[in-house]
């Protein structure tokens, strides 16, 4: 299997521009940016709940801790939300007020949380329709980590951000 494509800033902008023309654009922009800037796996995005991103005062958190059940490696890990993500999450949350803070952050028309598989199809479709060849649901995570590595971020920091315990 080939590696997911990494995106240039221009390609990411094309993807974000494309999402603006579609239904559920606030949700889709937030999902794309969570994979790119928080370097979350699609399964981790699907597992997010409102309480993971919104504090008791209704503000978007700067960081959160994903539980072991929410991560691929079954190990809790800390995730940081860049300002770009917080702005998009705030726009999404303002338009989709939760009934309960424990409810899934991203949900279907029946108010059920998306499965990782469904979100994979959504993200892959966004990349395809935006004309990004070779991009998959893993491209955002790979792009974010690659960009940090190219800027000289240390391997141990990258491992922590990625939730990897081994090189």
What are these regions (language model features)?
Residues 1-13, 73-82, 99-101:
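DNA breakage-rejoining catalytic core of tyrosine-based enzymes
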Residues 9-38, 42:
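Basic, Lys/Arg- and aromatic-enriched nucleic-acid-binding interface segment
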Residues 27, 133-151:
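Short basic/aromatic active-site micro-motif
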Residues 31, 43-48, 158:
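Alpha-helix N-cap/helix-start motif at helix boundaries, enriched for small hydrophobics
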Residues 34-35, 147-148, 161:
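Short alpha-helical segment immediately N-terminal to, or the first helix within
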Residues 47-85:
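Conserved tyrosine-mediated DNA breakage-rejoining catalytic core shared by Y-recombinases
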Residues 53-55, 133, 154-167:
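Short, polar N-cap/turn motifs at the start of nucleic acid-interacting alpha helices
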Residues 70-90, 102-124:
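C-terminal catalytic core of Y-nucleophile DNA break-rejoin enzymes
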């Amino acid at each position: 299997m080939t590696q997911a494509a990494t995106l240039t800033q221009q390609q990411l902008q094309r993807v974000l521009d494309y999402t603006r023309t579609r239904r559920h654009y606030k949700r889709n922009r937030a999902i794309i940016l969570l994979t790119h800037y928080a370097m979350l796996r699609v399964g981790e995005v699907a597992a997010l709940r409102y309480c993971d991103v919104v504090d008791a005062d209704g503000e978007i958190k700067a960081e959160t801790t994903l539980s072991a059940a929410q991560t691929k490696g079954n190990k809790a890990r800390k995730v940081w939300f860049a300002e770009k993500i917080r702005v998009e999450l705030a726009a999404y949350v303002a338009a989709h007020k939760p009934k309960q803070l424990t409810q899934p952050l991203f949900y279907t028309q029946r108010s059920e949380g998306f499965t990782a598989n469904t979100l994979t199809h959504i993200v892959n479709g966004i990349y395809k329709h935006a004309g990004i060849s070779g991009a998959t649901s893993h491209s955002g995570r790979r792009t974010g980590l690659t960009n940090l590595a190219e800027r000289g971020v240390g391997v141990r920091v990258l491992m922590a951000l990625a939730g990897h315990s081994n090189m």
